[in-house]
From Swiss-Prot:
InterPro entries: Ribosomal_Su5_D2-typ_SF (IPR020568), Ribosomal_uS9 (IPR000754), Ribosomal_uS9_bac/plastid (IPR023035), Ribosomal_uS9_CS (IPR020574), Ribsml_uS5_D2-typ_fold_subgr (IPR014721). This is Small ribosomal subunit protein uS9. Keywords: Ribonucleoprotein, Ribosomal protein. It comes from Mycoplasmoides gallisepticum (strain R(low / passage 15 / clone 2)). GO terms for cellular component: cytosolic small ribosomal subunit. The keyword Lipid metabolism does not apply.
Length: 130
């Protein structure tokens, strides 16, 4: 008998996460490492697990994630969206519950590019009147 897997793709800033949900005991593996070893901050892990806690499926599924690009916050946001989308693929009735907590919407904010003649995206050289 084949193991049923549900997939979800999440993106945030410059990070991309491919999430695979399989029936299991609640293990979370990120790039072949435990979540606690991969992320140094516990708050980031709690934020990432939010879709599972909202739907009360934290101990039902094992989660395997392949994530690349960006920093810890962007990767955690991408994983969070990927988990939410995988849960919706598994059970479309969960979408309403996840949408109330704003977990199925992609955060489209990205870093604004630096413009020529400026020091950053908006920081201009100091203006001298005389």
């Amino acid at each position: 008998m084949a193991v049923v897997t549900f997939k979800g793709l999440g993106r945030r800033k410059s990070s991309t996460a491919l999430v695979k949900l399989t029936p299991g005991s609640g293990k979370l593996v990120i790039n072949n490492r435990k979540a606690e070893d991969y992320f140094p901050n516990k708050i980031v892990i709690q934020d990432m697990r939010q879709p599972l806690e909202v739907t009360k499926t934290a101990s039902i599924y094992d989660i395997n994630v392949v994530v690349n690009g960006g920093g810890f916050t962007g990767q955690a946001g991408a994983i969070r969206l990927g988990i939410a989308r995988a849960l919706v693929n598994m059970n479309p009735e969960l979408k309403k519950q996840l949408k109330q907590h704003k977990l199925v919407t992609r955060d489209a904010r990205v870093k604004e590019r630096k413009k020529f003649g400026l020091y950053g995206a908006r920081r201009a050289p100091q203006f001298t009147k005389r």
